[in-house]
Amino acid sequence: MKRDLYETLGVQKNADEKELKSAFRKLAMKYHPDRNPGDQESEKSFKEINEAYETLKDPQKRAAYDRYGHAAFEQGGMGAGFGNGFAGGGAHGFSDIFEDIFGEMMGGRQRRSSGGRERGADLRYNMEISLEEAYSGKTAQIRVPTSITCDVCTGTGAKPGTSPKTCGTCQGTGRVRAAQGFFSIERTCPTCGGRGQTIADPCTKCHGQGRVVEERTLSVNIPAGIEDGTRIRLSGEGEAGLRGGPAGDLYIFLSVKPHEFYQRDGADLYCAVPISMTTAALGGKFDVTTLDGTKSRVTVPEGTQAGKQFRLKGKGMPVLRSSQTGDLYIQIQIETPQKLTKRQRELLQEFEQISSKENNPESTGFFSRMKDFFDTLSE
């Protein structure tokens, strides 16, 4: 029996893309054939890891696996409850499985019912927001051009006063069988195009499609703490279904614009702040404006070194759907003076002359240890 793909990668079933990639890289490094030459078990594990990752990183393949397990990818192989034949007795064949799944996923093929009803396609809308908007959350108005149910024929596709008729070729199934040698092949009905119905007198507004294109304005609630790459689903806001079929969904893909001052890592924020050499040496204070619009004071003690971090607790990003908040880390950068005047140069030279080892313990100790090291080598 094949191993569970999530178990193979060592992740939970709700693992996100980042967790999948991290687990894959870690295991791939461990079992890579170049690191384990001649080890057949490692080679086998490496192949299993690759297969698991290739399946789970693809949203459609992952949905197929979650629903049907390994049976979704086995030609002619049926999972429990799928029946015995590939195309006989009303059982789902390999292609039918994918029609069921992908008809519900991101614009895949829709499976037609015997009444000619088709589910509308899912739609994607890309939205870019600022870090400030991700911090506070917002309700955004978006305009989406999409197909909606025709208001003249109410989605039937037929002229008012008439109705679609059951296709006489396929008897409403949308599929016909044709014998070819020893095989019986099922294909889309050429008369109705797989809809199971024919329209003798189509609606003049939608031309028999049952829907028309229109731009709609929708409200999208973006919660505080939303992260870059988050997907928001608006159920039933995709394309209208055909001939009374259910509407698809609208997926909002969010991207957060890079910020001029802040970098984000989960719920924590990082900001590099340059200070003068004298402030670092003598100490000082400065204010930082945080994303909530308030100012926080940072106290720099004398002798502060470059790279020193100060933590402002609770001044980071809100955690999505939680009362918790991340922290803001201020990283100190020391700016070396440039374009010195003659007097400034003289003062710095004088400072250098009167400085002692105690003023610069790190550099003094470093060069002393380096000298001792090379002296030892030359002995």
From Swiss-Prot:
Amino acids binding Zn(2+) 2: C167, C170, C189, C192
Gene3D superfamilies: DnaJ domain (1.10.287.110), Heat shock protein DnaJ, cysteine-rich domain (2.10.230.10), Urease metallochaperone UreE, N-terminal domain (2.60.260.20)
One MF annotation (Gene Ontology) recorded for this entry: zinc ion binding
Keyword set, alphabetical order: Chaperone, Cytoplasm, DNA replication, Metal-binding, Repeat, Stress response, Zinc, Zinc-finger
Chaperone as UniProt keyword: yes
CDD domains hit by this protein: DnaJ (cd06257), DnaJ_C (cd10747), DnaJ_zf (cd10719)
Binding sites annotated in the UniProt record for Zn(2+) 1: C150, C153, C203, C206
Pfam families on file: DnaJ (PF00226), DnaJ_C (PF01556), DnaJ_CXXCXGXG (PF00684)
Cofactor(s) named in the record: Zn(2+)
J domain segment(s): 4-69
Subcellular location: Cytoplasm
CXXCXGXG motif repeat start-end pairs: 150-157, 167-174, 189-196, 203-210
PANTHER family linked to this entry: CHAPERONE PROTEIN DNAJ (PTHR43096:SF48), DNAJ HOMOLOG 1, MITOCHONDRIAL-RELATED (PTHR43096)
Function: Participates actively in the response to hyperosmotic and heat shock by preventing the aggregation of stress-denatured proteins and by disaggregating proteins, also in an autonomous, DnaK-independent fashion. Unfolded proteins bind initially to DnaJ; upon interaction with the DnaJ-bound protein, DnaK hydrolyzes its bound ATP, resulting in the formation of a stable complex. GrpE releases ADP from DnaK; ATP binding to DnaK triggers the release of the substrate protein, thus completing the reaction cycle.
Subunit structure: Homodimer.
Assigned protein family: Belongs to the DnaJ family.
NCBIfam families linked: DnaJ_bact, PRK10767.1
Protein name: Chaperone protein DnaJ
Species this protein is from: Rhizobium meliloti (strain 1021) (Ensifer meliloti)
